[in-house]
Structures are given as C-alpha cells and as structure tokens.
Amino acid sequence: MKLYVFENAVYKPKGDPFPGFLVQSDNNMNILIDTGVTPEDARRLNEIIGANDVEVGEARLPLNVLGRLGIAPQNINAVINTHFHYDHCGFNRSFSQAEFYVQKSHYEYALSSKDEAFGLTERHWDDPALRYHLIDGDQEILPGIRVVRTDGHVRGIQSVIVELKKTGNVLIASDAMRNSRMLADNVNPAQYSMFDTDPEMVNQGVQKLKRVIVEQNIQLVIFNHDGSVWPTYKKAPDFYD
C-alpha cells in the first residue's frame, strides 16, 4: 500500500495547503481521498472573502497531479469524500466511474441544508451519475482503509486511517482537526475556522480523534490546513508505504 500526498491549492496569507491524497492498494486499486477545489470555486470564494487569497494553478489540479503519476481519471476505483465543502469535492464528476464513500448523515445534511457552502458545491456532488456508498459511523470500507466519523467541522464529516506496512497507521484528519494547534490541551479547537457549524461538536470531534490516535496507534497525522507542518510531509511523486 502506498499513500501519495499532494497540494491542490494554497491559502497564500499563511501558506496553508488544500491537500489531496491517493492510496494505491496492494491489489492495484487507486483510491482518491477528496477531489480538490476548482479554479472557478476558488475565484468565487475569493470574491466572498474579498481577497485573492486562495490560489490553485494548473499544476495543482488533481487531474494533472494524477497524470504526472501515470493515472488517468478512469483508473480511479474509489473516492472517499471527507465532506462536501468546496475544497474537498470540486472534481467529483471527473471520476464518475468510481465508487464514492461518504457518511450517510453528511450526505443527507448536505441535501437538506440551507448552508451557502453546500450551494456552492452542489453541482459537484449531487449528480445521479455518481454512485455513493452511504456509510453509517466508523468502519473499514476497503482493506487497510478505515473512516472515523467525528461530526466536528460539519455534521457527518469523516477522517480516514490508512494502514501502511513501513510507516504504520496514518490519520488523514481532514477539517475535523485541520491543524496541529488543535491538538493542544489549552486551546479551543473551534476558534480556527469560520466554516465550523457547531463549536461544541468541533471540540467533541477533536477529543475523539485524540483517542483514536492513541487507540489505533497512529504514527503520522496529516493536518489538512497547517502551513507550519506541511513542508515536513512527503509529497508526490514521493510516497509513504
């Protein structure tokens, strides 16, 4: 099993990444974890926040990153969406041949929510051509790949554990624990994002992931939006195994 980490976009003021992940299994499956942000959505977000802070660029687009690894869109067997915010599902429709995995509670929440964040991305994920497996809670969804529902950042968000032989267990925390500062005991984790929908659930989600780190013997935590630790991770074409 191999885990590739790559950058789909960057938040320029802090150097915080918008990452994507590819897992190549021992039986030659290609599993994508989140599908990134489109240039159009980045422009729309920049308009909303009134600044040109989110930068994408052609080289960072998921299809181009995968192409440099020799992988075409039709070679992606499965996609795990941690959630449906703009930087996690932008290219879902590019992988319509894949099986998609998302928490049932999140899928239903996104469909019914009035949250503008889902209105921005609905065209990417609410497509009858996409085949979703709706997951209920923590479970192994593919050999060596498990999801952990936290509900922190938004209802039904899930983190992903990838079991690697050399590296050990890797936790892709997603936005449930988006930066390393949220691990500290003397901070309020909910202070770190305007997109968090329930501060108390953020705190509960972080506490759950802290327990998971110990109970699942996590050897590496990858934080989604932390420019301070991003340079320390291996990036594609390098990989963890």
Describe each model-derived feature in a short phrase.
Residues 1-53, 208, 215-216, 232-241:
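Zn-dependent metallo-beta-lactamase
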Residues 32-35, 77-83, 101-103, 149-152, ...:
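Active-site neighborhood of phospho(di)ester-bond hydrolases with catalytic His/Asp-centered motifs
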Residues 28-30, 165-170:
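Active-site beta-strand-loop-beta-strand hairpin of nuclease catalytic cores
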Residues 38-40, 84-89, 155-157, 178-181, ...:
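Active-site environment of divalent metal-dependent phosphoester hydrolases
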Residues 57-60, 65-71, 75, 102-149, ...:
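Metallo-beta-lactamase
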Residues 47-102:
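Active-site metal-binding motif and surrounding structural segment of the metallo-beta-lactamase
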Residues 2-5, 20-25, 137-165:
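Core dinuclear metal-dependent hydrolase active-site scaffold
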Residues 52-62, 167-241:
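Cap/insert and terminal regions of metallo-dependent hydrolase folds
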